Amino acid sequence: MSSMNKRVFDILRELDSLVDFSRAKLQWDILIILATKGPSSTTEISQTINTSRKSIIDAIRKLVDKELVTKVKGDIYGLSEKGEKLLESFDSIMSINVTDKPDSSIESNSISLTNIAEYFYMLEILKMALLNKQITIDKASHELGISKQTLKYYIETFTENKLLKVVNQESVLGKSKKIYVLTDESRKLVSRLPELTRLKRNLPLKILLKLTGSYRYEIALTKVMLFNVISIPVLMYLKDQLGILEAIWLYVIILLPLLSIFAEIFNRI
């Protein structure tokens, strides 16, 4: 790996260790707002990104703990010196190629990290494709909470940069649909980012996502909680009528939360 590429990946590791892109988008939104607008109140931040003030306060508390944000006065917060350096580190890798290829093909295979949002979605999409082998725009956009058009833009960008490749898959009904899978180039990137490397080894998470039909841990966890909230009262009401199904149902109620717990533990190892 060239010295420039090594520097890029070192910076990416540093960024990922300070604020986990794949799990803390709200924190990055706050950092971006403070970087562009300057010191702001929690109410202003809440209105800007259309998120509850309580969520903003919780996220800011975590950023303060990480020494990325500091209280200016009262309810107003601004970037700390460490926070400013974090964004400067990101700026330093904008438009830098992150490919090992030294020949003329380097231009078409390079990743231009034009903004933090692009980096966030790059990691999220790589993460989903890594855990689920393949992704579709419809399902991925729903789980990320963004429009299909927005996600399509990012996916097409990453496809052009050789991070994803499109495959036409035929359904049982004979209809063709586009799915996206990782390329060899993106697998190299995955192997160099700690967060994605941990996910690759996270078997409980892969099983949980498969059982719940989800791309992301947060969505799977929501489905598990909803399933248990509905199932437990129903099971108690019908317990004398289900027979062997009662034992199976109870097993699933216990299994899913356990998988959720182990998935989180494995992600921290």
From Swiss-Prot:
Subcellular location: Cell membrane
DNA-binding region: 42-65
Main location class: membrane
Tree of life domain: Archaea
Gene3D superfamilies in the cross-refs: Winged helix-like DNA-binding domain superfamily/Winged helix DNA-binding domain (1.10.10.10)
GO MF annotations, alphabetized: DNA binding
SUPFAM superfamilies to which the protein is assigned, alphabetical: Winged helix' DNA-binding domain
Ranges per topology, Cytoplasmic: 1-217, 263-269
Protein name: HTH-type transcriptional activator ArnR1
Native species: Sulfolobus acidocaldarius (strain ATCC 33909 / DSM 639 / JCM 8929 / NBRC 15157 / NCIMB 11770)
Gene: arnR1
